């Protein structure tokens, strides 16, 4: 089953992305933090730091990033101070009814999607120079970039719920963590667990072509910390 999920993951990510996706990684340094440099150089000015287990997104592949540096909000961090989430323990998943369930002795994650019902949402639009943005329930959304003004331009589906249990305790995931995400690709979801730090990562690649995106949610010691959205090149 694990190999099936990996195969489906590779097939879907290659199929819907216009370019390669980056990787999610976290800070793992013996000092407990990593320096953010102003430029891609160890002698460059230190502008800030990131503590261990800070989630970042970047391009590690030498074909697309020939340096050993990953760009973050305020500058650059060295790749050697980061660990990809794929290197943590993967939790196997399986379909149960309308849900995708990842379950082992420490963690259980249930991801449920549902069809988009336009009668239950407020649909508006925002005009830009040469294109129209779709706004749903007052929020900019992920999964559809250009709104054509008809039902064919509306999303097909979205997340209904994401529930997480860690060591038998429920972890509340706010609706705001996923209610702006659309065009869900079930079999591109994966879950990884850093047992030592008690950190859970839920990763999904959704939509296709120019609207493709990925998201990683992070739960630290039974508390939802946030998400990072990534885009292909």
Residue ranges and their predicted role:
Residues 76-143:
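Surface-exposed beta-loop interaction hotspot
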Residues 218-233:
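Short, low-complexity, Pro/Ser/Thr/Gly-rich segments in the mature regions of secreted, periplasmic
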Residues 3-13:
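Sec-dependent N-terminal signal peptides
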Residues 19-25, 46-82:
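SH3/SH3-like beta-barrel superfamily modules
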Residues 18-37:
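Short N-terminal segments immediately surrounding and downstream of signal-peptide cleavage
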Residues 173-215, 220:
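Acidic, glycine-rich flexible loop segments
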Residues 40-45:
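Short alpha-helix capping/helix-loop boundary micro-motifs
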Residues 136-185:
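Mature extracytoplasmic domains of secretory-pathway proteins
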């Amino acid at each position: 089953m694990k190999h099936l999920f990996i195969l489906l993951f590779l097939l879907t990510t290659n199929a819907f992305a216009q370019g390669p996706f980056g990787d999610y990684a976290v800070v793992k340094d013996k000092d407990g933090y990593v320096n953010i440099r102003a430029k891609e150089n160890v002698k460059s000015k230190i502008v800030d730091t990131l503590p261990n287990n800070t989630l970042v997104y970047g391009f590690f592949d030498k074909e697309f990033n020939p340096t050993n540096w990953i760009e973050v909000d305020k500058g650059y961090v060295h790749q050697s101070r980061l660990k990809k989430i794929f290197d943590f323990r993967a939790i196997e998943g399986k379909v149960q009814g309308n849900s995708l369930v990842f379950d082992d002795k420490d963690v259980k994650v249930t991801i449920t999607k549902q069809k988009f019902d336009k009668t239950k949402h407020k649909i508006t639009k925002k005009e830009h120079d040469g294109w129209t943005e779709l706004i749903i329930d007052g929020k900019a959304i992920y999964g559809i970039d250009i709104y054509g003004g008809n039902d064919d331009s509306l999303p097909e589906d979205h997340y209904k719920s994401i529930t997480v249990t860690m060591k038998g305790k429920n972890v509340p995931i706010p609706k705001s963590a996923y209610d702006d995400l659309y065009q869900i690709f079930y079999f591109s979801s994966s879950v990884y667990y850093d047992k030592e730090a008690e950190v859970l990562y839920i990763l999904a690649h959704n939509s296709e072509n120019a609207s493709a995106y990925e998201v990683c949610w992070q739960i630290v010691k039974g508390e939802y910390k946030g998400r990072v959205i990534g885009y292909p090149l």
